[in-house]
Structure formats: C-alpha cells, structure tokens
Swiss-Prot record:
Family label: Belongs to the NOP10 family.
Gene3D superfamilies linked to this entry: H/ACA ribonucleoprotein complex, subunit Nop10
Record keywords, A-Z: Ribonucleoprotein, Ribosome biogenesis, rRNA processing
GO terms of biological process kind: pseudouridine synthesis; rRNA processing
UniProt protein name: Ribosome biogenesis protein Nop10
Statement: the UniProt record of this protein carries the keyword rRNA-binding: no
GO cellular component: ribonucleoprotein complex
The organism of origin for this protein: Methanococcus maripaludis (strain DSM 14266 / JCM 13030 / NBRC 101832 / S2 / LL)
Job of this protein: Involved in ribosome biogenesis; more specifically in 18S rRNA pseudouridylation and in cleavage of pre-rRNA.
C-alpha cells in the first residue's frame, strides 16, 4: 500500500481514486531521508495495527 496524491485537488489518500473529486490518484515521491526520523513512531504504530 503506497501513499498517493490527487493531481487535481492535492489531497493525499491511500485509495486509487480521490474521495473529494473522484480523480485518479498518482503515487508521490518518497520523502527525503533524514537520520532523525520524526514520524517513525507513527509508521511503526500503523504497521503494528495492520498486523
């Protein structure tokens, strides 16, 4: 599952189509690497919740 962005309204989603404007969403570039992981605890919590 990859994060996607609607090119029309700019909203982020995990779905193939935007829930706001029903436009096909596209895959976004990965965030820049940083040794200080500000959002690591959120990613790990999301991954743990899916298991």
């Amino acid at each position: 599952m990859k994060m996607k962005k609607c090119p029309k309204c700019g909203k982020y989603t995990l779905k193939d189509f935007c829930s706001e404007c029903n436009e096909k969403s596209v895959t976004v570039k990965p965030p820049r690497f940083s040794p200080v992981d500000k959002y690591g605890k959120y990613r790990r919590a999301l991954k743990k919740a899916k298991m």
